[in-house]
Amino acid sequence: MSTRTVVIEGPERLEGVLHEGAGIGGAVICHPHPLYGGSMWNGVVDAMEEGFSKAGFTTLRFNFRGVGRSTGRFDEGVGETEDLVAACRFLKGVVSGEAGVPACGSMALPVEGVLNPNLAGRSVIAGYSFGAWVASMALARVAWATDLFLVAFPFSSYQTGEIRAFSGRIHLVGGSFDDISPLDDLLALHRDLKGEKRLKVIPASHFFEGHAGEISEFILESFREEEG
């Protein structure tokens, strides 16, 4: 499998990194808050990308506007939602070969030839902290998303209505010592969700120091359970 730097065209020009997977599902991963040093090279984002890649997904991580080589400036989540929609459109084009975007070589495999046939057609929007909120805000604009994977959703700053309205599979990760994403709020959200859902509580703070690998493991566990 190969990894390459890509440019995502949208309202801004965004830098991203595409990793071709062994299956025919795709996962877009959003980084934490740009004004607090968040970028696609964050350690938790690394762990998420590792987990999805090992599960067989083609992954796309990218920098929001104003971060790294991405053009533009921070836009309070409004422009960042547009960035995510553009990234999702780009990855969909890669996976399907639409819109003149070259399809990944592994995407040409028949379903019975992929690492996990049950990932066929699975499309994940994932995010950490601020990126988790942006992921939820984009759901109404990305009709093909089948899964939402949220790490440390910042309940202290943002509402959860879009998450509750999502009809696909929802995967939640939180730290038991997180004061930005309080555990009580996470458990309440998980309890209230009516559809298919998964929860992982890790003994960590908001930054998951020394525990990021548990996020990768949870991704593998979640999707391996759906094999066969």
Language-model features, listed with the residues they occupy:
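Gly/Ala-rich beta-loop-alpha elbow adjacent to hydrolase catalytic centers
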Residues: 127-135
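Short beta-strand/loop motif that positions the catalytic acidic residue
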Residues: 166-167, 171-174, 178
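Short alpha-helix in the alpha/beta-hydrolase fold that links the catalytic acid
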Residues: 168, 182-190
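Acidic catalytic loop of the alpha/beta-hydrolase fold
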Residues: 176-181, 207
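Catalytic histidine neighborhood in serine/cysteine hydrolases
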Residues: 193-207
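Catalytic active-site module of serine/aspartate enzymes centered on a nucleophile-bearing elbow/loop
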Residues: 212-228
